[in-house]
Amino acid sequence: LMKEYSSGYYKVPSVGAGTANTEFETITGMSLHYFGPGEYPYKSILKETTCESVPYVLKNLGYSTHAVHNNEANFYGRRSVFPNLGFDTFTSEEYMADENLQNPLGWVKDSVLTDEIIKCLDSTDSPDYVYTISVQGHGDYPSEPILDNPSITVSGSPTDELNCKWEYYV
């Protein structure tokens, strides 16, 4: 793939938590090194101030800009932050038709995102930028089998508990 298509490396500021900071760097191209230790721009400056971003650049090129996230709109203040980052629309789990479609851990399944992305694309005549954030993959993953007839089974981990966690993840 690297020989045939654009490719590169992508480094994120956090793993396992702090999704909003990874989003911030991705959407703005700005490093968190310019902020205080432990600061979340979503929880501070972006609640009240706009910031140059990919959505603003694309809006200037005639795109409609949409954000979609299958979690609560107020988590990390996204309800007020996304307009300040240039998104025309923001659809959160509260507005998703299949909100009750949850995985065994209570997260809204990613399968609802496809319909929401299509709704965004169908809502305008212009080109669209749809920024979509998944929540389903959040852990802590179950340490006992909870899936009936999993499509993929996992073995080879040091413990059965880890096998179950990996099996649920994949």
PLM regions with names:
Residues 1-170:
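Solvent-exposed soluble domains appended to multi-pass membrane proteins
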